[in-house]
């Protein structure tokens, strides 16, 4: 329950700009956040491997 309240609190518009927390829009994870995609690294990997993120492909060299 504590995690759910933290997610809801992070999604609300903060009174001050410095109080803003970056959280994944899909799962609410606070760590490993990728700003460009607004999701955590785990969700990014899952959706990128399924091909659901346009312009992202697995790199190989």
Curated annotation (Swiss-Prot):
Its cofactor is Zn(2+). Pfam families: Ribosomal_S14. GO terms for cellular component: cytoplasm; small ribosomal subunit. Keywords: Metal-binding, Ribonucleoprotein, Ribosomal protein, RNA-binding, rRNA-binding, Zinc. One of its GO terms (biological process) is translation. InterPro entries: Ribosomal_uS14 (IPR001209), Ribosomal_uS14_bact (IPR023053), Ribosomal_uS14_CS (IPR018271), Ribosomal_uS14_sf (IPR043140). Binds 1 zinc ion per subunit. Zn(2+) binds at residues 24, 27, 40, 43. Binds 16S rRNA, required for the assembly of 30S particles and may also be responsible for determining the conformation of the 16S rRNA at the A site. Belongs to the universal ribosomal protein uS14 family. Zinc-binding uS14 subfamily. PANTHER family: 30S RIBOSOMAL PROTEIN S14 (PTHR19836), SMALL RIBOSOMAL SUBUNIT PROTEIN US14M (PTHR19836:SF19). This is Small ribosomal subunit protein uS14. It comes from Borrelia garinii subsp. bavariensis (strain ATCC BAA-2496 / DSM 23469 / PBi) (Borreliella bavariensis). The gene is rpsZ.
């Amino acid at each position: 329950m504590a995690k759910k309240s933290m997610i809801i609190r992070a999604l609300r518009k903060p009174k001050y700009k410095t109080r803003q927390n970056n959280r994944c829009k899909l799962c609410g994870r606070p760590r490993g956040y990728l700003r460009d995609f607004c999701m955590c690294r785990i969700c990014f990997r899952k959706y990128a491997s399924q091909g659901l993120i346009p312009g992202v492909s697995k790199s190989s060299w």
